[in-house]
Amino acid sequence: MTRSRSRSARSRSGGAAPDTLLLLEHPPVVTLGRSARPEHLLAPPAALAARGIELHRVARGGDVTYHGPGQLVGYAIVDLAARGRPDVTAFLRRIEAVLCAALAELGVAAYTRPGWTGVFASPASAGPPRKIASIGIGLRGWVTWHGFALNVSLDPAAFDVIVPCGLREVAMTSVERELGHARPPALELRARELVARHFERDFALAPS
């Protein structure tokens, strides 16, 4: 998948392809972003391997995160130069807004927190903030080639092997957990359709 994204980014940079949104699901894997700290990996590589979890260092921004079945991962391949070279932080904020809109249609109220990247489930409770989506962007030239991970039906316990995004004060959650007994049928398909629709509407991205 990394090679596929890299090819897509090169094609977009060369003008041979349009802006694209890749939507997919990864097998169990822990990825280390450019800001990842060793102490945020709570299990040694051998222990991860014994549980069938791969470990990779990647070129996106951010710290450490987990990907696995039940999580919708989106890679936005976007030529920011063709869009007037907007601030990358502004691009991140737009992704957060798109995810909040899609989550609202799924029945999950969501919000963003000043100074933090990602999307959180609301209302805020007496416990720790509940993070439902993580975002990490990588750039090649002015082309983005990383994106977001939305926990749809993924068991949040999967994150126990890391300090997610380096935030010890955060608890991970999922759409399924937030909905409880209100979980609709075909939740994963519905989430994918809504995210694709909102990205297409807000970014004019063609899902792939």
What are these regions (language model features)?
Residues R34, G62-D63, P69-Q71, I137, ...:
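Gly/Ser/Thr-rich helix-start
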Residues M1-P129, H181, P185-L189:
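N-terminal lobe of the biotin/lipoate ligase/transferase fold
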Residues L99, G127-R130, G147, A171, ...:
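A broad "ordered helical/assembly scaffold" signature
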Residues L41-P44, I132-V152:
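Short, conserved beta-strand/beta-arch hydrophobic-aromatic motifs that form part
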Residues H26-P27, R34, L139, V152-L154:
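Residues immediately flanking
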Residues F120, G138, A149-S208:
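C-terminal accessory segment of soluble enzyme catalytic cores
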Residues V30-T31, E39, W142, A157-F159:
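Short, acidic Gly/Pro/Ser/Thr-rich loop/turn segments
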